[in-house]
Amino acid sequence: MLTATGKQRTYRLFKQNAHNYPRYDSYLAWHGCATCSLATVLGAYNDNYSGILPSSVIDGVEKQFTSNKDWTREHVNRSLRGQMPLSLYGISSILKSSGVDNNYVRTYTDSEAKHDIISHLKTGNSIIFEVRQKNSRTGKRTKRWTNSYHTMVLLGVLTNGKVLLCDSVDRPWYNGGQRLKIVDLSDIMEYMFPCTSFSESMYYNGASSDGGYIKIYEIS
């Protein structure tokens, strides 16, 4: 449970490759970062979904608020390797349809994003964001956060300026693989990226339209 600006909110942290999600073990292990991030935020902001699991997201709000054609394509028709995770647009849309207000920021400069992210976290609200393998500062590809693309959640900012991060994957370089991490914002922003094109696809269909971050707002 986290407390910020006088409010308390309970976030559940999920391990996408825990293999304890019936029917969707393999999908979540391969593609589940977006689903886990959505479950973490939805359960924290809307009491009607308190305790929701990633597998319940797939069979519940994801199925409800995406087209039957798209949902069936990703979870029934395609092979595991060909299946795709929810896009940031898809996450934003499902949250709004589930009563959780948010703003999907697609384009930004690093200086704008740094100020915007810290300011938003200081209100006690979270941010869902995307990173890639390529480091935007050095231009090199690393495995620090992902082998390709990865969705995570920023939960808050500490008094020392570091941010509290919810990651659905264990990483050996951080405290023996702990998924709740305290890191410098710059460590994340070096791997974040803005959109260079616009898409309303509910599922990932290319990095150019899936960058940016989602600012979550308290339900009024």
Regions found by a protein language model. Give the residues of each.
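Mid-length scaffold segments of soluble, non-membrane domains
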Residues: 83-104
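A short acidic/basic microdomain associated with nuclease active sites
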Residues: 58, 104-106
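Hydrophobic beta-strand residues in large extracellular and virion-surface proteins
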Residues: 41, 57, 127-129, 152-154, ...
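Extracytoplasmic/secreted envelope proteins and their assembly/folding machinery
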Residues: 34-42, 58, 88, 92, ...
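Active-site-adjacent structural segments surrounding the nucleophilic cysteine of cysteine proteases
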Residues: 1-83, 142
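Active-site-adjacent substructure of cysteine-protease-like catalytic cores
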Residues: 109-170, 174
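Noncatalytic regulatory segments and standalone regulatory/sensor domains
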Residues: 145-146, 157-220
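Sec/Tat-exported extracytoplasmic proteins
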Residues: 37, 41, 45-49, 65, ...
